From Swiss-Prot:
Any one of the GO CC terms: DBIRD complex
GO biological process: mRNA processing; regulation of DNA-templated transcription elongation; regulation of RNA splicing; RNA splicing
Function: Core component of the DBIRD complex, a multiprotein complex that acts at the interface between core mRNP particles and RNA polymerase II (RNAPII) and integrates transcript elongation with the regulation of alternative splicing.
Organism, scientific name: Xenopus laevis (African clawed frog)
Protein name, per record: DBIRD complex subunit ZNF326
Highest taxon listed in the record's lineage: Eukaryota
Intervals of motif Bipartite nuclear localization signal: 200-221
Source taxonomy: Eukaryota, Metazoa, Chordata, Craniata, Vertebrata
Zn finger limits (C2H2 AKAP95-type): 273-295, 365-388
Keywords: DNA-binding, Metal-binding, mRNA processing, mRNA splicing, Nucleus, Repeat, Zinc, Zinc-finger
Chain residue ranges for the region called Disordered: 1-22, 147-170, 202-264, 429-494
Length: 494
């Protein structure tokens, strides 16, 4: 459809009166429509309210709010940009005027649309003049002296940047598009950058220096793994050699255990009950324990937890009694060979008076894992302490748990199973040959070692705690106690 552009231009110009420029001025060149710049209004001062001024009272409350420093005689580009922004925010198209021609007053109109026209015939400032039709097309600046037309935020669809800030030295404008605005920040100043905030920007890759490289992966040399020497495969031994090797290792282990017990308990062999964790150096003490109610109560607890038959529990009791008898025989043999034994080294060898050390007797509490001085007052003080009362109950429960493990491990031993078969037949299972006796002794010692390891893992004594307990016990003795007695010659019975 053909259109008469000339008639359109003529009608648009005639519809607005009091224009400060005419079609003749615009015919010379595209930019001749802009008059010379005048920094001062050449009109005479008009008293009262200016009829051609915008309807806003800039001296009212909004003036103080926006910080305006201009009086009412000068038109403010910030207010015009706000009016233009409000016109678009009300749902109207940016290409259609936000007013009806019937409401237009001669010589005045609010600038509300992107293509709307204002009549500023009485204003001589060229930056206040509106652009002609099509002058604010896509990618074109609105005004010659300002890349953003003094209303820079209009190009981005946002609020104006403020009054009195659009007349300075303007930076170069970037590339702007209507539907997708792309801003190149390299050539924009501070004011333009602030105007472009909130606009979708190009996602540039992060800057990396020229010599910057990412984390290098650790590379292994191809021949590194080949240089590692592979251990030769172990030679397969026959069953007899393997059994012999295990026997020698077990005997060496038992020998070290005997030396450890000798250093711990002395040359005297201790009598022990594996179920009750009872230890005594006196034959009478172990005999009384095996016939006591405490030992019988422990056997009943084992039977209740393991569901063993009565013959099994009787056999386990006989095993403990047989162990006691073997210990007695070993002690007699050691006494016979006492003459051939080397003399024991003196414990106090190398101790000088300056070392302030002395040999004393102590009482060991297995429940608390502490050593108490062999004094009546110290022992009684420890018995009445709250720690001992609590540790005593805990230690008793621990013994009950370990007794079940001990009974189960004894019955799982192949040698003990063979003896149990003989015991059920009515034979004496403990009459063995010397070789079997040696093997049995090694197995019993190994069993005791396992039991002690379990006990140590659950409750390991601390030397520091022991010394602290001893110091506390000595410091807490009553004031009336006589400390003049010699601990080495004391006759207090513990």
């Amino acid at each position: 459809m053909d259109r008469e552009y000339g008639s359109y231009n003529q009608r648009s110009v005639n519809s607005y009166g009091n224009q400060s420029f005419s079609m003749d001025e615009m015919g010379d060149s595209n930019f001749s429509r802009f008059g010379p710049y005048e920094s001062y209004d050449s009109r005479s001062s008009v008293g009262g309210r200016d009829l051609y001024r915008s309807g806003y009272g800039y001296n009212d409350h909004e003036q103080g709010h926006f910080g305006d420093s201009y009086d009412g005689r000068y038109e403010n580009p910030y207010r015009n940009s706000v009016d233009s922004f409000e016109g678009r925010s009300q749902g109207g198209s940016s290409w259609d005027p936000s007013f009806t021609r019937s409401k237009v007053r001669t010589g005045f109109m609010e600038d509300r649309g992107r293509d709307s026209y204002s009549s500023y015939g009485s204003f001589s400032s060229p930056y206040m003049k509106p652009a002609a039709v099509g002058s604010r097309g896509r990618g074109m600046p609105a005004y010659p002296e300002n890349a953003f037309g003094g209303r820079s935020n209009d190009a981005f669809g946002g609020p104006s940047k403020g009054r009195g800030r659009g007349r300075g030295q303007m930076p170069e404008y970037g590339v702007m598009r209507r539907h997708r605005v792309v801003v190149e920040y390299k050539h924009l100043g501070v004011a333009a950058r602030g105007a472009a905030r909130g606009v979708k920007r190009k996602m540039a890759p992060p800057f990396k220096p020229v010599g910057f490289f990412g984390k290098k992966q650790k590379l292994s040399k191809p021949g590194a793994n080949q240089n590692k020497s592979v251990p030769p495969p172990a030679e397969k031994l026959s069953e007899e050699e393997e059994e012999k090797r295990r026997t020698e290792a077990r005997r060496e282990k038992q020998r070290r255990r005997r030396e450890k017990n000798s250093e711990k308990y002395g040359d005297g062999t201790a009598f022990t009950c594996s179920f009750c964790k009872f230890r005594s150096f006196d034959e009478k003490g172990i005999e009384e324990h095996l016939t006591s109610a405490t030992h019988q109560e422990m056997l009943d607890h084992i039977q209740k937890q393991t569901k063993f038959d009565k013959p099994v529990m009787e056999f386990l009791h006989e095993c403990i009694v047989n162990k006691f008898k073997k210990t007695v025989a070993r002690r007699v043999q050691s006494v016979a060979n006492e003459a051939a034994k080397t003399l024991e080294k003196d414990v106090m060898e190398g101790v000088n008076p300056d070392d302030h050390m002395m040999k004393v007797e102590t009482v060991h509490c297995s429940a608390c894992s502490v050593y108490v001085p062999a004094l009546h007052s110290s022992v009684q003080l420890h018995l009445k302490s709250a720690d001992h009362s609590k540790s005593k109950l805990t230690y008793k429960e621990q013994i009950k748990r370990e007794s079940i493990l001990t009974a189960t491990s004894i019955l799982n031993n192949p040698l003990v199973k063979a003896r149990y078969e003989l015991y059920l037949k009515g034979e004496n299972p403990f009459e063995t040959q010397p070789d079997e006796q040696q093997q049995e002794q090694e197995e019993e010692e190994e069993e005791e070692e396992q039991q002690e390891q379990v006990a140590v893992s659950e409750q390991e004594p601390s030397e520091q705690e022991t010394s602290d307990e001893q110091a506390a016990a000595i410091a807490a003795e009553p004031e009336g106690e006589d400390f003049t007695c010699d601990p080495l010659t004391t006759t207090d019975e513990v």
